[in-house]
Amino acid sequence: MKDLLKFLKAQTKTEEFDAIKIALASPDMIRSWSFGEVKKPETINYRTFKPERDGLFCARIFGPVKDYECLCGKYKRLKHRGVICEKCGVEVTQTKVRRERMGHIELASPTAHIWFLKSLPSRIGLLLDMPLRDIERVLYFESYVVVEGGMTNLERRQILTEEQYLDALEEFGDEFDAKMGAEAIQALLKNMDLEQECEQLREELTETNSETKRKKLTKRIKLLEAFVQSGNKPEWMILTVLPVLPPDLRPLVPLDGGRFATSDLNDLYRRVINRNNRLKRLLDLAAPDIIVRNEKRMLQEAVDALLDNGRRGRAITGSNKRPLKSLADMIKGKQGRFRQNLLGKRVDYSGRSVITVGPYLRLHQCGLPKKMALELFKPFIYGKLELRGLATTIKAAKKMVEREEAVVWDILDEVIREHPVLLNRAPTLHRLGIQAFEPVLIEGKAIQLHPLVCAAYNADFDGDQMAVHVPLTLEAQLEARALMMSTNNILSPANGEPIIVPSQDVVLGLYYMTRDCVNAKGEGMVLTGPKEAERVYRAGLASLHARVKVRITEEIKSIEGDVTHQTSIIDTTIGRAILWMIVPKGLPFSIVNQPLGKKAISKMLNTCYRILGLKPTVIFADQTMYTGFAYAARSGASVGIDDMVIPAKKAEIIEEAETEVAEIQEQFQSGLVTAGERYNKVIDIWAAANERVAKAMMENLSVEDVVNRDGVVEQQVSFNSIFMMADSGARGSAAQIRQLAGMRGLMAKPDGSIIETPITANFREGLNVLQYFISTHGARKGLADTALKTANSGYLTRRLVDVAQDLVVTEDDCGTHEGIMMTPVIEGGDVKEPLRERVLGRVTAEDVIKPGTADILVPRNTLLNEQWCDMLEENSVDVVKVRSVVSCQTDFGVCANCYGRDLARGHIINKGEAIGVIAAQSIGEPGTQLTMRTFHIGGAASRAAAESSIQVKNKGSLKLNNVKFVMNGNGKLVITSRNTELKLIDEFGRTKESYKVPYGAVMAKGDGSDVSGGETVANWDPHTMPVVTEVSGFIRFADMIDGQTITRQTDDLTGLSSIVVLDSAERTGSGKDLRPALKIVDAKGQDVLIPGTDMPAQYFLPGKTIVQLEDGVQIGAGDTLARLPQESSGTKDITGGLPRVADLFEARRPKEPAILAEISGIISFGKETKGKRRLVISPLDGSDAYEEMIPKWRQLNVFEGEVVERGDVVSDGPESPHDILRLRGVHAVTRYITNEVQEVYRLQGVKINDKHIEVIVRQMLRKGTIVSAGSTEFLEGEQAEMSRIKIANRKLEADGKITATFSRDLLGITKASLATESFISAASFQETTRVLTEAAVAGKRDELRGLKENVIVGRLIPAGTGYAYHQDRMRRRQASEAPVVPQVSADEASANMAELLNAGFGKRDDE
């Protein structure tokens, strides 16, 4: 019996391993796996259903069909275990060996493995240095290849056609050896001397100069070295033995009616075996060559189809015209082994049901239907019934539960007490999509959910379903309670704001309760306290909104924890006094002494959490919810059609707009504006009119006239239900009310362009047929978009998770002094994100100095919490250098100090926290939300009127950056530079406002001049881009030939003519090479030079430009020579946004990127070619100049003689992140990506902490390219993991050798995921075949560092609670590797001995 137990134990024990290696299998290895050769294509006997001998399901090879029973039935039962039956040859053992025993097929002719042949770049082709086409022709028996040239003039690896081969045979006889088919390739591979080849190539590499050749050689060297180091033999890429998958992994299942359902693999194997047997027979018969060849080709094709069907030629189809699923298809794709079974599995002990609202639940509870609980907790109930002696056996317990006896319900209650369950709502977009609750048994069949967690789940009660999971083990329950309980997840991991925030009705109730009303019943009472206020209200002596005086005692707790009491009589309302009763002690009364909208409530909970901690906040949140619901019901806020008050001014606003539009129409007809300008102006007029109507409507809705106690009429905030809902943030928004009571406004077509006739009606007035039809456009687009975009957003999240999954906090401090500079985000006249919000929760990288002094305000390595941020604000600090994950020096993972505060917990981050996944979820989750947002507005085009001026808001002085300008005739400045920035500086030298000033803008004030608030400092036309001259003189047309490069358009009505430049695409042959331009000449006809340069003033005109001047006209500096109509901008929403975010994270190069200066120096222009200019930058120190050819149509931002810094913009356009990294460094590219991504989310009002984006950027920057290898084993131009380069360099530095120099690479997230060190992680992401082929050839080891690899091999992940387990394993491994000679004194030894002896007791022997 004992050895039986030992045997069973051995069955369950898994091998301890630290890494997984993948390599090519040699024929001997395949044979060693195999339990026998499969010789026949038969599967099972159709009469007896027993497997055929030597067939694909043979019991002798693969094991018995029934447990411990041989096929003929001679040996049965356990006592014969291990006996091999002499009659049928089957070993008596468990059936499950049929899942692990493999067979093999001896191939009659070698066959190439299609993965190494066709997966690009072809490994066989690269190794032999032959083109893939040639190899394929040899393999599929179309041509010969020379294997040994001998003494002839034939080269090895030379391809011969049939005729050439016969000629050579005649000429040389058997001097040479040429073959066809896989044997030939196998022979070539076998004869290769890898090491010698490697030496040769390395010599060649040092000699060549051409870049392409170097690249090719490096690739070959890497492949050859991989073969040498991994111990793989090249000839193993050609199969001589084919392994056969265990039969239970390709089952054959009998269906009723005598038919069978079979795995496609059986068909594919059958094909291989049939062809192989036929080939053997033909070879035995010595059949004619052509027949044998054909059979060999067919065998090759059959093996190809088995390994990867459809990779070459047409896919082999089954009986139902569907391609058969080959081995490669089994592992790749969403339904493949990796993503279907290894990364996510279905679980038992789970159920799902519809959710309904549970407003009486506490935050940590959920309502679980009794029926469901009974089913989910069955085993626990059985156990309890037996324990109590109420049931003797499990069977009896089962019967009791089935009968649903009364005692069962009592026991269910006991079992469920304190046993948390997990609730999950699909799609689980971030970690708050699964939370733990304590179940409360309820009648009915729907799960009840606490309303406050709806925001985290993004759940609503319109039919959503949720799944329930039961954590079974004690550890799982502990984790669920400590980490996943809904009460522990109050703050959102994306931005650190509370996510358990009242919304909808609760907000309405609290808002209604805290509003005040003029002359309400009971105004002016003086009450002794909140309790009395409540009594007065309940007795009906005072209204909820009455303004009264109440005596309030506050217990104010500062963040340091000091408590001060103060009592005072405060002017407030009855409702606020009642609400004060549920506010926890420690918060000031001022927090509720205001009308509470959604923002105020969120701030209130946040303050509560920061000052009082978790428990009071949870209780407070619950109380606010109950109170909110109660008073929302009391308020009786309802919506009637009369609540949608249409403003009286609406008609006149629309009339004015219509007049303006008519005016523009006239201008268009008289040729003053182009069609595009007209369209844009019309749209702007209507957008502005819409804004005005909306403003009038909101003013109308938001106030009402009332009579106060003294009989005087005064205005108060309105109690209109619709207004209250929008104002509190409970339901609806100004944009939606505008559609109800203002005008619907402009609508968008499905392609995003705006229809220029707006819908002037609103929903209260009703739409006519045309208006209704126009609006259906937008509404349907919204629905279609949502369906398409949700998938895109999900895919973005998946890529982000994949690239960041192995980033974990691994140490406390890496000790770096580097960091990134944080400044407030200022856009236009408003601070979009103040400094405090950006640095809160970060660690300072340097001491922060008090401005204007030398005092240290904040020391280095301080975690900036709320008080520190207050201090920074008080001292008006403008810039802080904080630690960032991008500059963290930890090798694998990051350190806690570089990350800073754990946003969801509010303290510094713990070791083992999976920050990568959190970052990915935080960025990806809103993406999906945003795609859903669009259809709720119903297609109304949200587009701001185009900006045409800059109006400053504050007092201060102007500062212009990167500016060039000329004075025009009126003494105004005209801007001629393209990325000019205008800043407003206050008296402390802080930037208050910041604006972009476009080219051609006219400035009213210059650099350094003082302005007062509200002053307009710049004007421009938003719809055209002017061409401004910098010099005075006369116009001379160049290359402007009517009919070839330009057309004249004369207006019939006015007789005015304008010249339009043709787009180069529309020009005829001779016009294509001409460059239309305007030159400026002086009175003598000499070219006028641009001041400060020796370049003639000439302005190239891009296509579609309109010139309204004639040849020879006199002009002055600053005049507009021509206009280029700007394309209309479409609607602004996240559609533009999500793909933009994806582009940024994929680090895509924009189409026509900005050209940046490669080095610092002085600009000059060299010799021009036909279509390009030569830009020369000469460094100031006199070293070599840098030259670049730039197309002439690119607008240059620099002039001759100007000094530029490396990385400055030379020619405008969208910047390429790769250029920014190369020229300005890591921090600049981080800043660029962070700001651009934040821009998109900010537009939608979504807050994401910068940290998360930085985490992704760090992962994008994890590779470097070796510039010079030094003494390392790297190759020049090789791409390697930064951590590997750093470790290698540290080692070399310690030994005093030459280190490698490298440049950082920016990889897009898809590329970065596929380029990870771990092949398991990459293979389970995308392009599985390619990744595995590459890994196998190189014999890669996967160290199982990331999360994904560990999930796939079935271990705890090295993060969170699994972090300790992995640290422990690492320590054990190091201890076993390094034998230490202990140096101990005798006393210590005896003490230790005693300790060991004592500790030895009570330990199990397997620990």
UniProtKB/Swiss-Prot annotation:
GO cellular component: DNA-directed RNA polymerase complex
Entry EC no(s): 2.7.7.6
InterPro entries: DNA-dir_RpoC_beta_prime, DNA-dir_RpoC_beta_prime_bact, RNA_pol_asu, RNA_pol_N, RNA_pol_Rpb1_1, RNA_pol_Rpb1_3, RNA_pol_Rpb1_3_sf, RNA_pol_Rpb1_4
Listed GO MF terms: DNA binding; DNA-directed RNA polymerase activity; magnesium ion binding; zinc ion binding
Reaction catalysis annotation: RNA(n) + a ribonucleoside 5'-triphosphate = RNA(n+1) + diphosphate
Cross-referenced Pfam families: RNA_pol_Rpb1_1, RNA_pol_Rpb1_2, RNA_pol_Rpb1_3, RNA_pol_Rpb1_4, RNA_pol_Rpb1_5
Binding residue positions for Zn(2+) 1: 70, 72, 85, 88
Cofactor binding, note field: Binds 1 Mg(2+) ion per subunit.
Residues noted as binding Zn(2+) 2 in the record, renumbered to the chain: 814, 888, 895, 898
Keywords tagged on the record: DNA-directed RNA polymerase, Magnesium, Metal-binding, Nucleotidyltransferase, Transcription, Transferase, Zinc
Cofactor(s) recorded in Swiss-Prot or TrEMBL: Mg(2+); Zn(2+)
GO BP: any one term: DNA-templated transcription
Binding site for Mg(2+): 460, 462, 464
Subunit composition and interactions: The RNAP catalytic core consists of 2 alpha, 1 beta, 1 beta' and 1 omega subunit. When a sigma factor is associated with the core the holoenzyme is formed, which can initiate transcription.
Family affiliation: Belongs to the RNA polymerase beta' chain family.
Function: DNA-dependent RNA polymerase catalyzes the transcription of DNA into RNA using the four ribonucleoside triphosphates as substrates.
The protein's name in its UniProt record: DNA-directed RNA polymerase subunit beta'
Lineage per the UniProt record: Bacteria, Pseudomonadati, Pseudomonadota, Gammaproteobacteria, Enterobacterales
